[in-house]
Amino acid sequence: MGRPGRLGQCGGGGDVSFSVEGDYFEVCNCEVSCNCIWLGAATNDNCDLLLAWHVTSGNKDGVDLSGLNAVMAVHSPKRMTDGGWKVALYLDDRASAEQSEALGAVFSGGAGGHLAGLAPLIGEVAGVAPASITFEKTGGSLHAEVAGALSMSSDQLVGMDGQEPGVITNAPLSAVAQPMRQARAKDVSYHGHWSADFSGTNSFVTDFRYQG
């Protein structure tokens, strides 16, 4: 992984223009439903959170990012709002140098937008590096892998009508601004800069959109 530093510095700063959208899901070791998004305490002594994005369309400063993936691993204290998060960012190794720089700027928060609001909570960047990333979506099931480091899966949970998943909106602490569909994580394993293994825990799924 790359040299530790401030995540918001990835990809540079200054005036930027970007708009990206696509598929997103996250898994964590909290019980369903995660209390962290409501500024409460995690189920365990810490929150191990893994986030995966697949860009279906979008660009930064004219650099096309369609079809590329990014994954972030987060290790936070029991209350995420206390800050001091340890994070690692993985960028799709299929990207060109120009695309990788743009991808890193967008998903680190360095380009501004929604993710920039989480930057003050980060205490340590364990690394930022290219990786072979797989992102798959089949109906209400999603799966992502970072070769040699991470595997995560999620199944959406059906709501009261027996057909559609439950939806959470307007949570005060979230990596996305869009309504999130409730899901359950399964067979999650991360062995990168730290280790975390869990299953049957919380997951959220949505169609993300960032711009700045």
Language model features by range: what are they?
Residues 1-15:
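Short, Lys/Arg-enriched N-terminal segments with co-localized hydrophobic residues
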Residues 16-60:
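N-terminal ordered "arm"
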Residues 39-46, 78-83, 127-145, 182-185:
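Short, surface-exposed loop and linker segments with low hydrophobicity and enrichment for Pro/Ser/Thr
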Residues 45-115:
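Aromatic- and glycine-enriched beta-alpha-beta binding-site module
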Residues 62-69, 89, 123-129, 171-173, ...:
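Low-complexity, flexible helical/coil segments
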Residues 85, 89-167:
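Charged linear interaction tracts used for macromolecular binding and regulation
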Residues 157-212:
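Extended, charged low-complexity segments
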